[in-house]
Amino acid sequence: MMFPQSRHSGSSHLPQQLKFTTSDSCDRIKDEFQLLQAQYHSLKLECDKLASEKSEMQRHYVMYYEMSYGLNIEMHKQAEIVKRLNGICAQVLPYLSQEHQQQVLGAIERAKQVTAPELNSIIRQQLQAHQLSQLQALALPLTPLPVGLQPPSLPAVSAGTGLLSLSALGSQAHLSKEDKNGHDGDTHQEDDGEKSD
């Protein structure tokens, strides 16, 4: 009689233990699923961010490629112009007197020796002229741009020098206008003084 009772008691504890293990396993699976879901969400956000950065890089690449292609074409064009001008100089040179020939040859050699500071100065002047022409076309006042802000569609050689140059030009124009107004005021005062005499 004792054996069946012990057997019955053992069998009654087994479903409870099995039920507890199944519930625990389900909880673990649920926790792991939530963890994987969080990792998936994080990876998806990172993937979207990388895709956005990739499209931005591709856009910059296309822009720089077009700029590089345009500069390459312009360089070949300028090289061809220089070649033709050298040919014209070589044809005209024999018709000059010996003294003038030496002067022209010296001037040509000096023209070929362009230094980096001279190039930077030339590029800066061209950039200033281009910016001023754009500002005049847009009918905007000559005020310096905020630091770090570049005009659209302008290839900047140096952001700092371009902005400082534009700022300097704006202040010079403003000062010259004030000087002119002050001079006109002095002229009117002198005229009034003469009339009073």
Curated annotation (Swiss-Prot):
Region annotation (CCN domain) ranges: 166-197
Origin superkingdom: Eukaryota
Keyword annotations of the record: Nucleus, Phosphoprotein, Repressor, Transcription, Transcription regulation, Ubl conjugation, Wnt signaling pathway
Free-text comment on this protein's domains from its UniProt entry: Lacks the C-terminal WD repeats.
PANTHER family for this protein: TRANSDUCIN-LIKE ENHANCER PROTEIN, TRANSDUCIN-LIKE ENHANCER PROTEIN 4
Subunit note: Homooligomer and heterooligomer with other family members. Binds TCF7. Binds the NF-kappa-B subunit RELA. Interacts with PHF12. Interacts (via Q domain) with SIX3. Interacts with SIX6.
Protein name, per record: TLE family member 5
Organism: Homo sapiens
Gene name of the record: TLE5
